[in-house]
Amino acid sequence: MRQSLRNTRALLLIGLPAIVLACGGSDEPSTTPIAGTYAATFFHTSGASGQTDQIAAGSTLQITLAANGSTTGHLHMAASGGNPALDADMAGTWTATENHIVTFTQSADTFVRNMPFTWGSDIQGISILTGDKVFAGTRIEVTLTRASTY
């Protein structure tokens, strides 16, 4: 019996520090809850010429945020007001702060890489990314709703 208690005590002395070290955390926020495929469900622009519902006009934005920090997807901006249609690849990377601010790094020069998005959830508990920023007098408001997890 004494030998068994000594063995148990020895295992605890050796095993407990190993367990504690294995559970060490990171200062970086977890990206796993944010990862998933998102699509624009609200996409408005407004400026001197008025407000435009970009989804109704034919614009789309779909982006997949992988758990490893990479992105894929596509942005299509419908032609309007003499501006031609724009198509852009959303390939790149994404990061999130502990305050749930998501930013994108992409080679495509679009508002997506220059707008911080806030991660949260809608009234039904579905993950959303919301962005709202003014670029050269045009306000862009976007809500991306997660369709699936990655």
Which residues does each predicted region cover?
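Bacterial N-terminal signal peptides that target proteins for export
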Residues: 1-12
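Generic short beta-strand segments
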Residues: 39-46, 70-79, 107-108, 130-134
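C-terminal motif of bacterial Sec signal peptides marking the signal peptidase cleavage site
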Residues: 19-22
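N-terminal glycine/threonine-rich, aromatic-flanked beta-hairpin/loop signature
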Residues: 52-100
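Edge beta-strand at a domain terminus
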Residues: 86-100, 132-150
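Short, solvent-exposed coil/turn segments at beta-strand boundaries
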Residues: 62-72, 96-100, 117-129, 146-150
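N-terminal helix-cap/turn-to-beta initiation motif at the start of protein domains
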Residues: 24-39, 64, 149-150
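An anionic, turn-rich surface loop/hairpin at beta-sheet edges
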Residues: 55, 101-119
